[in-house]
Amino acid sequence: MKFAVIVFPGSNCDVDMFHAIKDELGEEVDYVWHDTENLDEYDAILLPGGFSYGDYLRCGAISRFANAMKAVQKAAEQGKPILGVCNGFQILVESGLLPGALMRNENLKFMCRTVQLRVENNETMFTSQYEKDEVINIPIAHGEGNYYCDEETLKQLEENNQIAFRYVENPNGSVSDIAGIVNEKGNVLGMMPHPERAVDELLGGAEGLKVFQSILKQWRETYVVNA
């Protein structure tokens, strides 16, 4: 399986994402610059955290216009797994690939610590290796991770089982304790916590690795078993 890590000016979690795929998952991965127009050779697309374009205007508001995002949109339409973490989640929302918005944290402070997440839906291509309602420890590092959507959108997210992760103790004011959501098709996941920072027991824990293992399992079942 071949992954692409999209690198925007100001990305700073691309190396962590690359490490998670290459060294922990053992799969092929490339850094792909934001002006790339073709992602056809890749099986999965990863949008890392950071401060793309300095977070000017709004987080992700400029990155949504990058050439690579047109290719990401195409990949999403093809059903390829798209994972956006932190700033990557913000970019997915700004691009319209996921509903809602991400606002300043309720306490107006940057937060950097490990939090507990509850797996709300383990039937997605990103969460299949977790148990339903499993509680995992994953780091957060954001100033604008307060997820918001209107009541109608929240109702749709809940009815369609699109809420992948919830905070056990809400750190930022996110509506309904939401930490991560998928699109209706189930192949685009956006989450504020950083699973790529929790892939090695020597570095504090590996409870985020199952996100990437789930992607790999889905791909193998789809393309290897049926080959």
UniProtKB/Swiss-Prot annotation:
One of its GO terms (cellular component) is cytoplasm. GO terms for molecular function: ATP binding; glutaminase activity; phosphoribosylformylglycinamidine synthase activity. Keywords: ATP-binding, Cytoplasm, Glutamine amidotransferase, Hydrolase, Ligase, Nucleotide-binding, Purine biosynthesis. Its EC number is 6.3.5.3, 3.5.1.2. Residues 3-225 form the Glutamine amidotransferase type-1 domain. SUPFAM superfamilies: Class I glutamine amidotransferase-like (SSF52317). The active site is at C86 (nucleophile), H194, E196. Its main location: cytoplasm. It is found in: Cytoplasm. GO terms for biological process: 'de novo' IMP biosynthetic process. It comes from the Bacteria. Pfam families: GATase_5. InterPro entries: Class_I_gatase-like (IPR029062), PRibForGlyAmidine_synth_PurQ (IPR010075). Pathway: Purine metabolism; IMP biosynthesis via de novo pathway; 5-amino-1-(5-phospho-D-ribosyl)imidazole from N(2)-formyl-N(1)-(5-phospho-D-ribosyl)glycinamide: step 1/2. It catalyses: N(2)-formyl-N(1)-(5-phospho-beta-D-ribosyl)glycinamide + L-glutamine + ATP + H2O = 2-formamido-N(1)-(5-O-phospho-beta-D-ribosyl)acetamidine + L-glutamate + ADP + phosphate + H(+); L-glutamine + H2O = L-glutamate + NH4(+). Part of the phosphoribosylformylglycinamidine synthase complex involved in the purines biosynthetic pathway. Catalyzes the ATP-dependent conversion of formylglycinamide ribonucleotide (FGAR) and glutamine to yield formylglycinamidine ribonucleotide (FGAM) and glutamate. The FGAM synthase complex is composed of three subunits. PurQ produces an ammonia molecule by converting glutamine to glutamate. PurL transfers the ammonia molecule to FGAR to form FGAM in an ATP-dependent manner. Part of the FGAM synthase complex composed of 1 PurL, 1 PurQ and 2 PurS subunits. PANTHER family: PHOSPHORIBOSYLFORMYLGLYCINAMIDINE SYNTHASE SUBUNIT PURQ. NCBIfam families: FGAM_synth_I, PRK03619.1. This is Phosphoribosylformylglycinamidine synthase subunit PurQ. The gene is purQ.
